[in-house]
Amino acid sequence: MEYENFIRNKSFRHVDAGFSCPEVLPYPLFDYQEPLVRWACKRGKAALFADTGLGKTIMQLAWADQVAKHTGGPVIILAPLAVSLQTIDEGKKYGIHVEKANPGATFFGPNIVITNYEQIHKFDPDVFQGIVIDESSILKGMQGKRRQEITDFGMSIKYRLSCTATPSPNDFMELGTQAEFLGIMSQIEMLAMFFIHDGGDEIGRAHV
């Protein structure tokens, strides 16, 4: 079988599970940013791979703000510790209020809170209506237990956004971790469905 036909037979259509944004978005978005925010909201579960300088932070904040307003509930952003305070400051510039999430606090209403990955076990995922993972490329470098903890945390949250400026689109491990967090399919399912072994001697060698 030709590989093009192999892929075609494996294809499936993802059904949008999100919502439509208002006609006017109250953020200083560039022309290329606004369609991406609208697309991510419409998808419900989406990934934004935007290179450095393309405005990943404002897009994820706009998405989080729209989810919070649409659901009337809180959205949590997971980010590396050094990025958390930067994101709060960026939000101030764009008129989007972001608070540091304190363990034990009560979260309600259309609010956006942020914490670092290491604190995730201190929060209840059922409280949140949306989740953003920033610098999501680090998922593939995390130990299995921590990566699974983040994936499991997001599974009960309806709206999910994965953001990174440094994706490795040819790294099937990264594709798998991103797809698994978004609830599309597990890494094992992805490898079984879309990758074939080339028959060589190298263990684990696979081709798309």
Describe each region flagged by the PLM:
Residues I7-F49:
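Conserved pre-motif I regulatory segment
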Residues R43-W63, S136:
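Walker A/P-loop
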Residues A82-A105, L182-S186:
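Conserved helix-turn-beta segment of the N-terminal RecA-like "Helicase ATP-binding" lobe
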Residues G72-P74, K93, G130, R147-R205:
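Conserved P-loop NTPase motor "coupling/switch" region that bridges the ATPase
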Residues F107-K122, C163:
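Conserved two-lobed SF2 helicase motor
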Residues T57-W63, T71-G95, P169-L175:
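Conserved Walker A/P-loop ATP-binding site and its immediately adjacent core
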Residues D124-D126, S136-T151, F172:
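Conserved ATPase-coupling elements of RecA-like P-loop NTPase cores
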